[in-house]
Amino acid sequence: MNQKNPKDTQNFITSKKHVKEILNHTNISKQDNVIEIGSGKGHFTKELVKMSRSVTAIEIDGGLCQVTKEAVNPSENIKVIQTDILKFSFPKHINYKIYGNIPYNISTDIVKRITFESQAKYSYLIVEKGFAKRLQNLQRALGLLLMVEMDIKMLKKVPPLYFHPKPSVDSVLIVLERHQPLISKKDYKKYRSFVYKWVNREYRVLFTKNQFRQALKHANVTNINKLSKEQFLSIFNSYKLFH
């Protein structure tokens, strides 16, 4: 949670033991380039430069950028960039993984940018536990939007006592693992519109009564409130056929 904003609370993980314990749950290796979101005081950055080929640390706070540079000195495989991660242009021609202990209040925006504007195969983020569950929830728009690009797994609980100051919520380390897109790029705008109407239960806007019945039957739906990924995509494909 190291992207500074007056309304953000800065919660740092400072124990070297805890930092290593968390990073051991990632698959970051000496072959990897890493983009770190919110380097803060450099506690994770110090370990990341040891375990990877290179680190690009993104930090919005100028003072913390300087602290990060001092923390990793004299390592040479590190670049610290002072900018807002929501304005950062992800590289297009190199492979990289993402790591970040991210601010809770802009977690949604960061996850969307990683999913739709980066090319990272693996992104490891420390997030609020309730938020992680929402990312996996196929009853919500965010979960439905992400599922066509990412598999999302919880890897490790990160208890409040790991942080300074201690947050009032539980946190988890998650991984966003990119897979082959489940819909074509040309269909994404239509899919996004479909998702928002679906979660708002605007079924009559999407289908006629007969079309809706056919779509559910084709997807083998028995409970509209408990759809699998495959069932939802089947319903969307029926929608495309009808429109």
From Swiss-Prot:
EC number: 2.1.1.184
Record's keyword annotation contains S-adenosyl-L-methionine: yes
GO MF term set: 23S rRNA (adenine(2085)-N(6))-dimethyltransferase activity; RNA binding; rRNA (adenine-N6,N6-)-dimethyltransferase activity
Name used for this protein in its record: rRNA adenine N-6-methyltransferase
Record's keyword annotation contains Phosphoprotein: no
One GO term describing the cellular component: cytosol
Tree of life domain: Bacteria
Pfam families: RrnaAD
GO terms of biological process kind: response to antibiotic
NCBIfam families linked to this entry: Erm23S_rRNA_broad, erm_A_23S_MT
Job of this protein: This protein produces a dimethylation of the adenine residue at position 2085 in 23S rRNA, resulting in reduced affinity between ribosomes and macrolide-lincosamide-streptogramin B antibiotics.
Family: Belongs to the class I-like SAM-binding methyltransferase superfamily. rRNA adenine N(6)-methyltransferase family.
Organism whose genome encodes this protein: Staphylococcus aureus
